[in-house]
C-alpha cells in the first residue's frame, strides 16, 4: 500500500525505495510507464503527480507534474503495455502503471498496489474510490447527431451495448446510473 503522495514521489523525485519510506529497500526504483501520448499517462500525471508539484498560485500543475515524472531516474517509457508488464516483472524493484486489462492478463506475475488504502477492484473503479481509476468517454454534439444520423445511431448502439462487451476487453462496466444519464443526454440532444 502507498499513499497518493508516496506514489507521486515513487514516480518522480525518489531515486531509491528508501527515499519514500525508510524501511523500504535502499535499491533504485525502476519505473515503467506509458508514453506521453497515452491517456493513461495523462490521467496518472493529473491525478497523482500534479498535486505534488503545484504552480506559483498553489494549484495542481499538470505541466510541473509531467516535467517531474519525465525527469525521474531509471524511467522506461513505451506505448506497448506488454513491454511495461515485462519490465515490471523483470525486477523486484520495478513499478509501473498501465491498463487493468494488462494486469488481468498477467495477474500470476504482477501484484496490484493499493493506493490510500483502496485496492483496485471492480467496486472501487465503479464508485471512484480507487484514486487512479478513470472513466472513458466518447464525445459528440447534438448538432452533429442531428446532421449525421449515423453518428446518433452509433452513440445509441454504444450506450445500449457497451456493458455487454466491455468486460471482455478488460474494462469495468459503467454503472446503470451513468449509462441512464448518458442515454437521457442522448435523447435530449437528438430531440433538440
Residue ranges and their predicted role:
Residues 1-192:
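Flexible loop/hinge segments at secondary-structure junctions
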Amino acid at each position: 500500500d502507498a499513499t497518493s503522495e508516496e506514489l507521486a514521489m515513487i514516480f518522480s523525485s525518489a531515486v531509491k525505495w528508501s527515499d519514500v519510506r525508510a524501511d523500504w529497500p535502499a535499491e533504485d526504483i525502476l519505473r515503467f510507464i506509458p508514453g506521453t501520448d497515452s491517456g493513461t499517462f495523462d490521467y496518472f500525471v493529473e491525478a497523482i503527480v500534479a498535486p505534488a508539484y503545484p504552480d506559483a498560485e498553489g494549484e495542481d500543475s499538470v505541466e510541473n507534474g509531467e516535467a517531474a515524472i519525465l525527469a525521474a531516474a531509471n524511467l522506461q517509457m513505451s506505448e506497448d503495455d506488454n513491454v511495461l508488464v515485462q519490465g515490471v516483472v523483470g525486477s523486484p524493484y520495478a513499478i509501473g502503471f498501465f491498463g487493468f486489462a494488462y494486469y488481468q492478463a498477467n495477474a500470476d506475475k504482477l501484484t496490484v498496489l493499493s493506493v490510500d488504502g483502496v485496492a483496485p477492484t471492480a467496486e472501487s473503479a465503479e464508485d471512484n474510490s480507487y484514486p487512479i481509476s478513470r472513466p472513458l468517454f466518447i464525445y459528440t454534439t447534438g448538432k452533429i447527431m442531428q446532421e449525421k444520423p449515423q453518428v446518433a445511431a452509433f452513440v445509441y448502439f454504444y450506450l445500449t451495448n457497451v456493458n455487454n462487451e466491455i468486460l471482455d476487453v478488460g474494462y469495468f462496466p459503467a454503472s446503470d446510473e451513468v449509462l441512464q444519464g448518458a442515454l437521457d443526454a442522448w435523447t435530449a440532444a437528438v430531440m433538440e
